[in-house]
Amino acid sequence: MIVKPMVRNNICLNAHPQGCKKGVEDQIEYTKKRITAEVKAGAKAPKNVLVLGCSNGYGLASRITAAFGYGAATIGVSFEKAGSETKYGTPGWYNNLAFDEAAKREGLYSVTIDGDAFSDEIKAQVIEEAKKKGIKFDLIVYSLASPVRTDPDTGIMHKSVLKPFGKTFTGKTVDPFTGELKEISAEPANDEEAAATVKVMGGEDWERWIKQLSKEGLLEEGCITLAYSYIGPEATQALYRKGTIGKAKEHLEATAHRLNKENPSIRAFVSVNKGLVTRASAVIPVIPLYLASLFKVMKEKGNHEGCIEQITRLYAERLYRKDGTIPVDEENRIRIDDWELEEDVQKAVSALMEKVTGENAESLTDLAGYRHDFLASNGFDVEGINYEAEVERFDRI
């Protein structure tokens, strides 16, 4: 059949297998051009890498950079729905297939484990695989985005919420497909919702992974572990950083400090990344309007980055520098949101957001760029793919 995107409430309900494959191949191509022999000369390099949440966005870019930039062996974990002959799989499932196929072609070791990374069963599978291969991890990337987590100790399923504290949040958001502007409101969270969000999106599971891998002797001396986070602009603070998600991110940062204290042989960091269109960010109110405005400003300035540009910069200019140092802020966080939060960028973005109406959103902001990134994360609007061609089956790429 001919496959067109099915979008409802900022969620794309289907995926294009060949589009996903081409998207992965394009990122691999970019990585090879960016992480040159000159970039790597005299710097340490990752050899054995575990990526938790490897199938989309920053996690996928991290795995691609490790493997195709530095030649690392990778184990990836993600929870995806497989395609069948007649039914769509999730984009991440096709991305994983494309990654493994490309790795095999280049003789790179890659194992993708499909399942709930929050569970102890999946941790045991990773441990078994690493022992079988005889490797210790020197880089562990924690890039999980999930609305729910079942606590392995209690069996209780916790659900995260995106809510402010204290008072109702009201802000402008835009429908990226119609340009329609609307006010949205979010009611304040109660204590139970805040605690549940920390359970899902805080550092508890990250710490559990590190402890179990450490106990089994699978962490290389000097192993780096990273968890990804976001701070963002003033416009989203009340809902995001000063709300329930912010509470979880604070817990994540506290976890990094604790991991460093308890495991002197490893280095744990939170990496604060740029705001981008991912399957996770597309459903956050206010974010589409902010990102469409940000993209406009940064593209005009010439320093706009997507996931792969951000992550190759993270590896080349933060994690694996020639002088061996990892630059951090006063909270020991790696900052690659630096270009996003430059004062002139934020001033220009705020000014744009003030002027936006339903009539001028398309011309004033980069809604077209936002739409492209949103569709491309599901395998659509990818250059070089004929979307009028029939897709014969959905269980392969």
Swiss-Prot record:
Binding residues for NAD(+): 53-58, 79-80, 116-117, 144-145, 249, 276-278
EC number, UniProt record: 1.3.1.44
Uses in biotechnology: Used in the biosynthesis of medium-chain volatile alcohols as biofuels engineered by microorganisms. The switch from the native flavin-dependent enoyl-CoA reductase used in the production of n-butanol, a key second-generation biofuel, to a flavin-independent trans-enoyl-CoA reductase from T.denticola leads to an order of magnitude increase in product yield in engineered E.coli.
GO biological process: fatty acid biosynthetic process
Pathway terms, separated by semicolons: Lipid metabolism; fatty acid biosynthesis
Catalytic function, reaction form: a 2,3-saturated acyl-CoA + NAD(+) = a (2E)-enoyl-CoA + NADH + H(+)
Active site residues according to the UniProt entry: 240
Site (Plays an important role in discriminating NADH against NADPH): 80
Known regulation of activity: Inhibited by lauroyl-CoA.
Top-rank EC class of the record's enzyme: oxidoreductase
Record-listed substrate binding positions: 230
Keywords in alphabetical order: Fatty acid biosynthesis, Fatty acid metabolism, Lipid biosynthesis, Lipid metabolism, NAD, Oxidoreductase
Outcome following mutation: residue 370 to A: The catalytic efficiency and affinity are relatively similar to wild-type toward crotonyl-CoA and hexenoyl-CoA
Purpose of the protein: Involved in the fatty acid synthesis (FAS II). Catalyzes the reduction of the carbon-carbon double bond of crotonyl-CoA to yield butyryl-CoA. In vitro it can also use hexenoyl-CoA and dodecenoyl-CoA as substrates.
Family the entry assigns: Belongs to the TER reductase family.
Further details from the record: Possesses high activity for the reduction reaction, but no activity for the reverse oxidation reaction.
Known partners and oligomeric status: Monomer.
Name of this chain's protein: Trans-2-enoyl-CoA reductase [NADH]
